[in-house]
Amino acid sequence: YTGKDALKDSNEARDFHRYAAQQFAQAGADFLYAALIPTLPEAIGMAYALAETGIPYIISFTIQADGCLIDHTPIADAIAAIDDLVSPAPVCYMTNCVHPGIVMQALLQPCNQAEIIHRRFLGIQANTSALSYAELDHAADLHSSDPETLADDIMKLRSIVPLRIFGGCCGTDARHMKAIAERITE
């Protein structure tokens, strides 16, 4: 999550991720999903590698409450850069392994008050803990919220962006997914 091991150059990232993308394409994948992408250069390189397959794909960023990827690139700027550089562009963008409360803080930052967020940022795979990555990395105990609280938090997030993809990540189980599904269909 820190981005310290992320590839620093988009061409290097494209070359690194190309083999896996091509293997999934040759295996007949319906779509490709790149998760936990912490930096813009890695996201661009990943997008190039996935776009080369011709298969629809999604990029999912690692984001922080300040509204940025781990490398301090605002989410709106990262989306705009990839959409401008890579063809075909991702189907959409999302985030994973983060609590919806942190995502709400991130998307409400001035740097992300852009139409592109509302049009292109469409999903979350949520953690149940509202702690930051750094806090979770050093936590001695499992932190979790109950299913109804997580579903409420996702619905609050959905009130500011038109989320269409929902899933769980760290700390979630079938109870959390059921609560989210019930709230979406109300």
Could you say what each language-model-derived stretch is?
Residues 1-186:
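Domain-level signal for soluble alpha/beta catalytic cores
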